[in-house]
């Protein structure tokens, strides 16, 4: 009797194209940004940055390999793994974004970790509610978070403070002004981007593309559950002032310092919360 394996190599045309695209993109980036592979030692001499070379090449090879694999799993197992990835990946995304921005993440208390995790989970839950597919939620949530983190890094470099909620009202002006700056990616950005590609590729392979055996009622219930979680998180973070209970507060006069001490996402969400100021009793615009 032939033993059934849940993991096997699947050299199909689509898999080869995906693997080739990942390999080509990572190789082109490595060549174009080759200075990232070098660093100066204490004497000022150039030497190979081993951690970057190993991390970049390792993640590139891993992403390429994942594209060539096929996971033969039961539908229920795929569904469970998909939900688990949507719940766990916001945590790793938080780590990637804060490492890119150089916050004091490894000194954060458990409450601050939870606060940042909930902020990212809100984004992923919204993406899942819109698409009802784990791989799409991971792709959209991860891309939005990583883009925000990279943009925040450059904004801090240019003006000395992070992205703030009210900056979104002048987004067009910011795009016009940003054309005059030079953007040089960092090693952490490159490694973070490849990690994101690995997670999306793994989720596409493992999580269900769709559940044809599931009823329409199940699909509706699944979407409503994701919307309910998103709504509950939004209410907890904003009207109920949940962030303050998790030791999250910002200094209006030192936004950069605040974001380094409490996390990029938590700092942004806390500032957004402060914009929702209740109208004082007896206030009248005509007065």
Model region roles, listed by residue range:
Residues 141-287:
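N-terminal secretory/membrane-targeting segments
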Residues 2-166:
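Extended, compositionally biased non-globular segments that define protein topology
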């Amino acid at each position: 009797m032939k033993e059934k394996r849940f993991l096997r190599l699947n050299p199909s045309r689509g898999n080869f194209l995906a693997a080739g695209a990942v390999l080509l993109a990572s190789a082109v980036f490595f060549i174009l940004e080759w200075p990232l592979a070098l660093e100066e030692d204490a004497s000022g001499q150039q030497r190979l940055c081993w951690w970057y070379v190993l991390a970049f090449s390792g993640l590139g090879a891993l992403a390429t390999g994942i594209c060539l694999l096929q996971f033969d799993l039961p539908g229920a197992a795929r569904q469970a793994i998909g939900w688990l990835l949507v719940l766990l990946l916001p945590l790793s995304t938080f780590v990637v974004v804060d490492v890119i921005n150089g916050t004091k993440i490894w000194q954060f208390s458990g409450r601050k970790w939870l606060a940042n995790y909930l902020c990212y989970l809100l984004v992923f839950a919204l993406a899942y509610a819109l698409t009802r597919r784990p791989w799409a939620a991971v792709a959209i949530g991860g891309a939005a978070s990583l883009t925000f983190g990279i943009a925040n890094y450059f904004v801090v470099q240019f003006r000395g403070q992070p992205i703030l909620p009210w900056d979104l009202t002048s987004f067009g002006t910011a795009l016009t002004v940003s054309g005059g700056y030079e953007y040089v990616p960092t090693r952490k950005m490159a490694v973070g981007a490849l990690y994101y590609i690995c997670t999306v590729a793994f989720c596409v392979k493992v999580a269900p593309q769709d559940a044809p055996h599931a009823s329409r009622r199940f699909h509706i219930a699944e979407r409503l559950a994701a919307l309910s979680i998103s709504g509950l998180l939004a209410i907890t973070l904003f009207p109920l002032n949940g962030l303050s209970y998790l030791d999250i507060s910002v200094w209006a006069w030192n936004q950069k310092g605040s974001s380094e001490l409490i996390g990029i996402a938590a700092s942004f969400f806390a500032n957004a919360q402060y914009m929702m100021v209740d109208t004082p009793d007896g206030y009248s615009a005509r007065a």
